[in-house]
């Protein structure tokens, strides 16, 4: 089944056909770095991380670019409030963002272009728009003349006449028309500034992404993504600038994530109803946060609550318990010389769930439906292990490989599937279990208890049974 993507531009699902066979070029709007990332930001970047992972899992080579807006009105305002240098403030929060994304197991982009390192590229882009008659210089900067671009509004479906009536227009003294937006802002006293043909100043927000995405991905590329709040004006203005400059369709698939909601309102810094990634990571494993996000389709609103996070935590524990059950069962599993009814049932459940998983992910990356298939395998394999005395290695291996594929796509279970490390760990743990058993035989209970306690601190729990000591991994 081909991958189908919901294209915001057409408001329908379309079969995904990249411009270059086997390769996907993808741009995701990155943060304006003036504060700590919150869960609303994380929702977007986890969603696009999983989309990228799935495309790679399906065999595509993905070139992913995500920008940093490291000069902006918000950065200047925050720097004035704190007394920091705007450059240092942006650098601090840029590093914090990268640290938080790494903690959340979001794979790094291939390129992270920063606005301040692309000023000449931005100036060249604006000059091209001027030469083509789409941009003009006003008293306070350079503006894009919206009404000259005939397709304006095709992404957001906003009509120009409605915009002129005052719907979300940007202020500016030098505008010819109220709907026009800034490409270059002339410097104000005390603000960071760069030399340009129009005097000292800095770029407008929208031109930055048009410039940096096309520099690294070309004048046409496959996927442009971001949050729903970027559809208008940001992405609408990006289309106008880029297609005016290049003279043809710019981006083929526009993808947008739904809002993270708190008590019926969008989580945002302006409303003060946000929880930072760092706050959550103090209380929850990063995989809990990922699973919380993946329990809803990326386009749907996601309601944040402590109960919702706890539900994700419990679900993650269920999956880890299943993995542990498989691992323990592997030690007594036998080669499959014969299958009986329990094996056929387990095999069919795994086979059908794998099919459902890929069908869901091919259908606009529907992680919520895909997760249902994951829990079907979890339930089926646990049921199988209660039905048989000696499980078959082939059944356990198929379940194990399914969870490994899920982990690769969803960014879960990473510690379980670093195989070489896991094998070495298991050999060492088994050796310590044997040493502890010998110590107990010799009545050296203090040392035996010491081994048990130290292993527990490392996430290994020992259980003494009539058949001997078994161990399992736990979250610490």
Swiss-Prot record:
GO CC aspect terms: cytoplasm
Any one Gene Ontology molecular-function term assigned to this protein's record: cysteine-tRNA ligase activity
Compartment annotation: Cytoplasm
Catalysed reactions, as listed in the record: tRNA(Cys) + L-cysteine + ATP = L-cysteinyl-tRNA(Cys) + AMP + diphosphate
Cofactor note: Binds 1 zinc ion per subunit.
GO BP, sorted A to Z: cysteinyl-tRNA aminoacylation
Cofactor: Zn(2+)
UniProt xrefs under SUPFAM superfamilies: Anticodon-binding domain of a subclass of class I aminoacyl-tRNA synthetases (SSF47323), Nucleotidylyl transferase (SSF52374)
Binding site for Zn(2+): 29, 209, 234, 238
Entry binding sites for ATP: 269
Keyword Aminoacyl-tRNA synthetase: yes
Positions occupied by motif 'HIGH' region: 31-41
This protein's name: Cysteine--tRNA ligase
Organism: Thermococcus gammatolerans (strain DSM 15229 / JCM 11827 / EJ3)
